[in-house]
Amino acid sequence: MKLKFSKMHGLGNDFVVLDGVRQSVSLSPEQLCYLADRHFGVGCDQILLVEKASQPGIDFRYRIFNADGGEVEQCGNGARCFVRFVHDEGLTDKREIRVETMRGIISPRLEGDGNVTVDMGIPRFLPAEIPFLAEDDVIIHLLDVADETLETSVVSMGNPHAVQVVDSVDTAPVGEHGPLIEKHPRFPLRVNAGFMQIVDRHAIKLRVYERGSGETMACGTGACAAVVAGIRRGLLDSPVRVTTRGGDLTIAWGGDERPVLMTGPAVTVFTGEIEL
């Protein structure tokens, strides 16, 4: 079958976006892996699928698949690309839309300057909500990795994150520790591993080793999780500029039981059609 797609990115975190509203899209894990393959397919970190909403009062359904073919709960950079895509494709003329994801409703908004702000929902910290194997809900957990004990904050932004503070993201052992943290036995569903350098109380640098994709140029939910973790630890104040390898995001959080707001760009690189 022939499938139309758009190639997009948010700060270098790149996506193949599929319109499941105007074309039938039902792909096997093998086909998803083929699409994501940078040598034989289109190439991307994740595949985003736009579908009709399954409930009233919601505009669209948003599904996310990693490069390994597995479906995941949430992707912040993808959410920005999602709202840009549905506007550019004429699927809606609303500046703010309500979108259902695997883990709840999000409300991305297209700003006048072309950036997109996404209400990423309320962060969760209880170990059972991550999920993370621990008895207590504490701000810092000790995680044994590669003969080291790491001070780690665990946060769910609809998907699981483990965040640690490092002296420098340039020398952080992302390639070594990232996959070990991702598959650590205390995270039953695996985890995204964040490495955060504090610049000042309103700025950080961040690298993220993403679950199922490896290190990416940027991770929206990872940026949210890092800022939330830093604020809870008393290291940061909202709003925070997050500098990733792909560019900058602005993250704002008002505290417990309040949603995290993420603002940043979304870019269409090209459109095309592929035979599957």
Curated annotation (Swiss-Prot):
GO terms for biological process: lysine biosynthetic process via diaminopimelate. Substrate binds at residues 13, 46, 66, 76-77, 159, 192, 210-211, 220-221. It is found in: Cytoplasm. The keyword Iron does not apply. The active site is at 75 (proton donor), 219 (proton acceptor). Its EC number is 5.1.1.7. One of its GO terms (cellular component) is cytosol. InterPro entries: DAP_epimerase_AS (IPR018510), DAP_epimerase_DapF (IPR001653). Pfam families: DAP_epimerase. Its main location: cytoplasm. Keywords: Amino-acid biosynthesis, Cytoplasm, Isomerase, Lysine biosynthesis. Pathway: Amino-acid biosynthesis; L-lysine biosynthesis via DAP pathway; DL-2,6-diaminopimelate from LL-2,6-diaminopimelate: step 1/1. It is an enzyme of class 5 (isomerase). The record marks 161, 210 as: Could be important to modulate the pK values of the two catalytic cysteine residues. It catalyses: (2S,6S)-2,6-diaminopimelate = meso-2,6-diaminopimelate. GO terms for molecular function: diaminopimelate epimerase activity. Catalyzes the stereoinversion of LL-2,6-diaminopimelate (L,L-DAP) to meso-diaminopimelate (meso-DAP), a precursor of L-lysine and an essential component of the bacterial peptidoglycan. Belongs to the diaminopimelate epimerase family. Homodimer. HAMAP family: DAP_epimerase. This is Diaminopimelate epimerase. It comes from Dechloromonas aromatica (strain RCB). The lineage of its organism: Bacteria, Pseudomonadati, Pseudomonadota, Betaproteobacteria, Rhodocyclales.
